[in-house]
């Protein structure tokens, strides 16, 4: 979520700064003083942070200035953040009714099956304020391929999944950028190293290496700047990793390298799926189960999570 906030804040800042509009981000990584908040026209923040600010009934001088509330990824209502979003919306609507002070509430989502229910919750006039776009509005057609593994033993299944991932990566290596989603932080580096080692054993590593001297120089300098040891090791081979356990500087470094097409394969957790705009030609979702520590068992990914990852791809495996 912090990665999304940082990206959106930078995007709006670059677009609005020429017009004198001040944009700031407000998260656990970046704090703002009351004076800075008062001078800010657009605040990009997380639900939890805005919940803390808006619930202070003793000081509403800043929240009363808000005239537009945009909730990106509004489908998070079904997630653990759902109650926080509900509280923010309810608090905003109550303030509008008490003060007769209108605030426009906009909800955005790429994966919202029950959009009519959410529209009703946000008090949207469905005749004029509800916009729904089906898949045929997508500018690039999406081809999906699902591969089922019948192996029951965990170790063999993981090995087979690695082999299938390598085969699919090699179908596009050297031609298109590839984004691979894994479901744990450790698995990002393990998967990237497996792909590198497998390609090296088959003498096929050249297809992943930068083809231009400029990209090679960029990756060499990036590897020197990277703080994560696994990232430093992998960058020189044209591979990148991305997860919430990395420093913000490393995450932004990887995002810039992938956007600049300097690295060909990026292995990530779901942090990239939730709003960071890094589309790839091919997306591989390595496994459809994620470990839930609260339930102490493996659970299937929700349809919303799958669709979020699909949204970054032209091809899903």
Mark where each language-model region is.
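A short beta-strand element within the Helicase C-terminal
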Residues: 265, 272-288
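Post-DEXD/H (motif II) to motif III coupling segment of the RecA-like Helicase ATP-binding lobe
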Residues: 76-135
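Conserved helix/coil segment N-terminal to the catalytic DExD/H
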Residues: 29-67
